[in-house]
Curated annotation (Swiss-Prot):
Residues 108-178 form the BTB domain. This is Germ cell-less protein-like 1. Coiled coil: none annotated. Residues 67-76 have a biased composition (Acidic residues). Transmembrane segments: none annotated.
């Protein structure tokens, strides 16, 4: 709304007003002294005052003409009040302008027509819009027109959104419902209303959830709200695996899913094989969007559907078919080396025949050479932080702790003889390199020292998937001797909100040096 200024003329307080009148009259009303008053402890009956005892003498300390300390103090107080700025919001002003000028259209000097509706507005208010400011100040023919036909090329904009956008020029604040924010944002961008665009962005960031995230992400990209786009991507990285949802899988585009699966910040639950399983379910829902079952039924239905496809395309991986080719770029971001390191997972991915066998063959070869280096080439693990390698090739795994208590676990898979046990107890998270103390299903390295590069993240979410609290160790190198354990995180009890989600990234061996 345009700048407004006002002066507020204040009435003097009653007591001060009466004293001022007494001063102008040259005196004050006095009652005759009686009783103790004559003894030197009289009472003051000045107009506008309460009866009060005088400490000594028969004159009145409250008399406006008395040259006393009390009078000086009162004068100082009045002076202080006169020089103290006061702020008073005229609540009715904005409402009056909005009602009279915008809703009633009084004294309108221009009409805006759009989408079959007409608004009686005022150029002085419309100039707050970059769109109309350029129109009126330039050499456009519309600058002298009283009726302007506004073309609306954006299908997101409707009459209600234009009503809110135009109305925002006549008022200080606008209430935006999450269900209407995209339409209002579209109108605000068309009219170049920076303040309203910013308010839409804040509303979107505050209301990201499973129902809004995909729409917000798309709209943020369309209208250039990078901060909203980033917020949506963060929400998806945190919730895609931790709070799987059928409708969300249907809405997620190939481009967005590619970003999520390729990120080392994806909050994984369990292991890489679970990312593959989630991708398989997502791809099924992209191809069969009419499916309408529950999350519990989804994996079974997915496997049945892909089983039928294998019969139709015998000898060909699904990603090599015409139906599957659009999804290749997403599945390329799977870290297959952490899937084939577990026997059960390797068998499933071979049987599914979703991923081309050539992809798997190259990974088998890569891991075989890595194992030989670990066994025969004095490989003791990473010795320095290689962020690029960690971001692109680290093992991703996680665990949900439903309530406080004691937990001890290991993530499945062959990790080059490094059997890592993770313990949560008494607000501590502990890593232990197990060699001989506890049974292990695979072979265990007996090297005196082994190192790993890791990052541990911890998070809690509210019912909408919004991050409540989080902590991270950042990327670190940890060297452990046989059966040695190390506290990697000490948790503040104030941050312990269950369920608690733990996610880790690991590198067990150094990347092979290229000759």
């Amino acid at each position: 709304m345009g700048s407004l200024s006002s002066r507020v003329l204040r009435q003097p307080r009653p007591a001060l007003a009466q004293q001022a009148q007494g001063a102008r009259a040259g005196g004050s009303a006095r009652r005759p002294d009686t009783g103790d008053d004559a003894a030197g402890h009289g009472f003051c009956y000045c107009a506008g005052s309460h009866k009060r005892k005088r400490s000594s003498g028969s004159f009145c300390y409250c008399h406006p003409d008395s040259e006393t300390d009390e009078d000086e103090e009162e004068g100082d107080e009045q002076q202080r009040l006169l020089n103290t700025p006061r702020r008073k919001k005229l609540k009715s002003t904005s409402k009056y302008i909005y009602q009279t000028l915008f809703l009633n259209g009084e004294n309108s000097d221009i009409k805006i027509c759009a989408l079959g509706e007409e608004w009686s507005l005022h150029k002085i208010y419309l100039c707050q819009s970059g769109y109309f400011s350029s129109m009126f100040s330039g050499s456009w023919k519309e600058s002298s027109m009283n009726i302007i036909e506004l073309e609306i090329p954006d299908q997101n904009i409707d009459v209600e959104a234009l009503q809110v956008a135009f109305g925002s020029l006549y008022r200080d604040d606008v209430l935006i419902k999450p269900s209407r924010v995209v339409a209002i944002l579209a109108a605000a961008c068309l009219l170049q209303l920076d303040g309203l665009i910013q308010q839409c962005g804040e509303t979107m960031k505050e209301t990201v959830n499973v129902k809004t995230v995909c729409g917000y992400y798309t709209s943020a990209g369309t209208y250039g709200l990078d901060s909203v786009k980033k917020k949506c991507l963060e929400w998806l990285l945190n919730n895609l695996m931790t709070h799987q949802n059928v409708e969300l899988f249907k809405e997620l585009s190939i481009n967005v899913m590619k970003q999520l699966i390729g990120s080392s910040n994806l909050f994984v639950m369990q292991v890489e094989m679970d990312i593959y399983t989630a991708l398989k379910k997502w791809m099924f829902l992209q191809l069969v969007p009419s499916w309408n079952g529950s999350l519990k039924q989804l994996l079974t239905e997915t496997d049945v559907w892909f089983s039928k496809q294998r019969k139709d395309f015998e000898g060909m991986a699904f990603l090599e078919t015409e139906q599957g080719k659009p999804f290749v770029s997403v599945f390329r971001h799977l870290r297959l080396q952490y899937i084939i390191s577990d026997l059960a997972s390797a068998r499933i991915i071979e049987q599914d025949a979703v991923v081309p066998s050539e992809w798997l063959s190259s990974v088998y070869k890569q891991q075989w050479f890595a194992m030989l280096r670990a066994e025969q080439d004095s490989e003791v693990g990473p010795q320095e932080i290689n962020k690029e390698e960690l971001e692109g090739n680290s093992m991703r795994c996680g665990r949900k702790l439903a309530k406080d208590g004691e937990y001890c676990w290991r993530w499945t898979g062959f990790n080059f003889g490094f059997d890592l046990l993770v313990t949560y107890t008494n607000r501590y998270i502990i890593f232990k390199r197990n060699t001989l103390n506890q049974p292990c299903s695979g072979s265990v390295s007996l090297q005196p020292r082994r190192s790993i590069a890791f990052r541990l993240r911890l998070a809690s979410f509210d019912s909408s998937g919004k991050l409540i609290c989080s902590r991270t160790t950042g990327y670190q190198i940890l060297t452990l001797e046989k059966d040695q354990e190390q506290v990697v995180m000490n948790l503040d009890s104030r941050l312990l909100i269950f369920p608690l989600y733990i996610c880790c990234n690991f590198l067990y061996i150094s990347p092979e040096k290229k000759n």
